[in-house]
Amino acid sequence: MKKIMALMLALVLVFALCACGGDKTPANNASTATDVSKAPESEAPAANGGDAAFTTAVSGKLIMATNATFPPYEYYEGTTVVGIDAEIAAAIAEKLGLELEIDDMEFDAITEAVKGGKADIGMAGMTVTDERKESVDFTDSYATGVQSVIVTEDSDITSVDDLFATGASHVVGVQRNTTGDIYTTEGIEDAGLGNIDRYSKGADAVQALKTGKVDCVVIDNEPAKAFVAEVEGLKILDTAYAAEDYAIAMSKNNTALYEAVNAALKELIADGTVQAIVDKYINA
């Protein structure tokens, strides 16, 4: 009888231990399920400049290099840089969960700032050119521009063709390292049809025109309209010097950020945000 009782007690203990072991298995599975559910968050693209999908020059920020003397694309209202590029950049930053910070600098420093990683994007009504593509990558185009010619109202230059006429010898004012500079250097200066005076700001070139130091100014059409509206005695020729595409300059060494910015830009173009921003500043 004692043997039977001992055997029954042993069996009870075995079942009890098995039951306890069974309780532990679901607990472990629950813990594993929780970890798996959190994994996508840690691996998802994090727009914070951290170690996730992409990095930025400053964690949590999108640094935009610009030259804020280019209305209506970028210019100052008080101490704040506003304009088409500023608003598009802000919309991109918002999509990426970043804070936009604008760094105003000389135009010819923008490409180097982007190339060297001091800025994440370069926006300054920047035209895509083969020369610039050697240093930086460009996103999809978000706007088109036209190079226009500003002259005094009594100028003997009546069309762009006059700049290329046989025996022409005009002094052309441009903003240094802009496409106006590039185009006129190749088409006028290198061809022996005149000289190019280069200025750090478009406004300085326009002032040189007003005071007679240059015969005309070649500059993007939208700032040209703004300058002519501000300065009496100037006009824009009816014929354009050249047409071009504006895009965002980015480093060749940050593919992940490039893809994120370009994807955000595409979405903003597709949903009409970019066009709405352009229309806000430019009347067709």
Predicted region positions:
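Bacterial lipoprotein signal-peptidase II cleavage site
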Residues: 16-32
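Extracytoplasmic small-molecule ligand-binding "clamshell" domains
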Residues: 35, 48-125
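A ligand-binding cleft/hinge motif common to bilobed small-molecule-binding domains
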Residues: 108-109, 126-134, 185-186, 208-211, ...
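Ligand-binding clefts/hinges and TM-proximal coupling segments of bilobed small-molecule sensing domains
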Residues: 49-54, 179-197, 232-238, 265-284
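Acidic, polar ligand-binding/catalytic clefts
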Residues: 90, 94, 99-163, 240
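Extended ligand-binding regions for polar small-molecule ligands
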Residues: 86-95, 154-155, 161, 167, ...
